[in-house]
């Protein structure tokens, strides 16, 4: 889950307001099933789910913010987003066909009719660990800056340890 936490921290430019976690140690002393809810000061909420014992290996991140709900499945990989467009810019994309996977649905609410836009992105599947190793080697050879530097890695680890601590306390 530490990699998923790192991804969330890189996507959300805000301080963490609160962490909630639940899970279980089923096979031994390590957490095998983990659910974490990270709430940021900006109002963004990220739900992370990870399981080492499920029939299908699970790594999903769900983020919620005003007018946008995103589900990222890191195993497939794919990203699905539901956007309530208040600016009508997505409506133009649908009309012009500039975003092929984008669909539009109208929903009647107490505030009137709202448009919800659904988009599904399926990025090229890559071996994340191999990419990370290659980036590390490249940084050594070129004295470059890694995608995840020590400070960012430490922050992700601190959050992961806090999640583990909360699971242990609650379990």
Predicted regions located by residue number:
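Generic structural motif recognizing short loop/turn segments at the entrances and edges of beta-strands
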Residues: 15-17, 75-78, 101-103, 112-118, ...
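Proline-rich intrinsically disordered, low-complexity coils
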Residues: 77, 97-101, 123, 146
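C-terminal helix-rich "cap/oligomerization" subdomain common to oxidoreductases
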Residues: 41, 121-123, 130-171
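Charged, glycine/proline-rich intrinsically disordered loops and linkers
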Residues: 85-119
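Contiguous beta-strand/loop segments that form the cofactor/metal-binding neighborhood of enzyme cores
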Residues: 2-89, 126, 130-143
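Juxtamembrane/interface motifs at transmembrane-helix termini
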Residues: 66-68, 92-93, 167-171
